Amino acid sequence: MKIVVLGAGAWGTALAISAAAHAACHEVQLWARDAQQAQAMQAKRQNQRYLPGLAFPPGLHVASGDMAALAADADLVVVGTPMAALRGMLERLDGCAAPIAWLCKGFEAGTGLMAHEVCAQVAPRLHSGVFSGPSFAQEVATAQPTAMVAASPRATVRDALVQAFHGPALRVYASEDIVGVEVGGAVKNVLAIATGLCDGLQLGMNARAALITRGLAEMTRLGLALGARPETFMGLSGLGDLVLTATGDLSRNRRVGLLLAEGRTLAQAVESLGHVAEGVYSARTVVQRARAVGVEMPIAECVVALLDGELRAAETVARLMEREPTVERH
């Protein structure tokens, strides 16, 4: 099976390593936008910038240049770029015959569209889906046990992802609910900022549990309003990804919350990370999409107010705690 992974960041590299390591019959091409970066990775057999010290398996090769030509000869194409770059990538892949799956999580800034909605706009002929779930790149690359979800309305896409990645260290489940999986991936990043803030302010385990639970309710309400299945949010791409991103210190979104709790500005927090924290860029869009369908998301609203400088860290908590009493709704 020939697998092409577009994007040589931490996550794209990790999945390329995973695919090449667990099946010797796989030929894996990792595409890097920068030709010098590609040459350096191919020569040194590692990604020193994002996953230093992790050697590439023999079946993994690094390329650059014409990505559409590379994809044209693939059995599966995986797009490992951030949400902001997805539209441009899909436009260049329009007409590709191979199944295509993206890894990004969030709603598109400006349009508020989910990834599959962007694909329907710019490349409707593609057989596409999303590969998501509770997974840190470092742990996937080092073959620590992980479970993920391959979601697509097309069985060909789901089956290709299972064939490419299911192995001793990575269990892949299939789902038809691409809406639910994408909503879970977008909202959990925003909620992880809130949980990081909570932990940074040392508000205790009770507060953390409340935030995660009520955050899951917000995620579910939005997902149902957009056509998702309720059971998806109890699975890997919902509750699973939320728990990991909200509590794991490898989470960039959680670290944004921790840094804001220390009194850093948003610009300082983002600069100190050195990598993209999708929740910072998708929070406003999540709230806008929720308002458009009449869904109340008070935690996400407070995160947006914090990121926009309308609230300070302690004020964010006070706003949530001072809301009027109500019945517990999911």
UniProtKB/Swiss-Prot annotation:
Family listed: Belongs to the NAD-dependent glycerol-3-phosphate dehydrogenase family.
Catalytic activity: sn-glycerol 3-phosphate + NAD(+) = dihydroxyacetone phosphate + NADH + H(+); sn-glycerol 3-phosphate + NADP(+) = dihydroxyacetone phosphate + NADPH + H(+)
Sites where the protein binds sn-glycerol 3-phosphate: K105, G133, S135, K188, D241, S251, R252, N253
One CC-aspect GO term: cytosol
Active site, UniProt feature: K188 (proton acceptor)
The gene coding this protein: gpsA
PROSITE patterns membership: NAD_G3PDH
Database matches in SUPFAM superfamilies: 6-phosphogluconate dehydrogenase C-terminal domain-like (SSF48179), NAD(P)-binding Rossmann-fold domains (SSF51735)
Any Pfam family matching the protein: NAD_Gly3P_dh_N
Residues noted as binding NADPH in the record, renumbered to the chain: W11, R33, K105, A137, R252, V276, E278
Biological process terms in GO annotation: carbohydrate metabolic process; glycerol-3-phosphate biosynthetic process; glycerol-3-phosphate catabolic process; glycerophospholipid metabolic process; phospholipid biosynthetic process
Subcellular location: Cytoplasm
Purpose: Catalyzes the reduction of the glycolytic intermediate dihydroxyacetone phosphate (DHAP) to sn-glycerol 3-phosphate (G3P), the key precursor for phospholipid synthesis.
Single GO term (MF): NAD binding
Pathway(s) this gene product operates in, as recorded in its UniProt entry: Membrane lipid metabolism; glycerophospholipid metabolism
Gene3D superfamilies attached to this UniProt entry: N-(1-d-carboxylethyl)-l-norvaline Dehydrogenase, domain 2, NAD(P)-binding Rossmann-like Domain
Keyword Cytoplasm: yes
Record-given protein name: Glycerol-3-phosphate dehydrogenase [NAD(P)+]
Keywords attached to this entry: Cytoplasm, Lipid biosynthesis, Lipid metabolism, NAD, NADP, Nucleotide-binding, Oxidoreductase, Phospholipid biosynthesis, Phospholipid metabolism
Keyword NAD part of the UniProt annotation: yes
EC number: 1.1.1.94
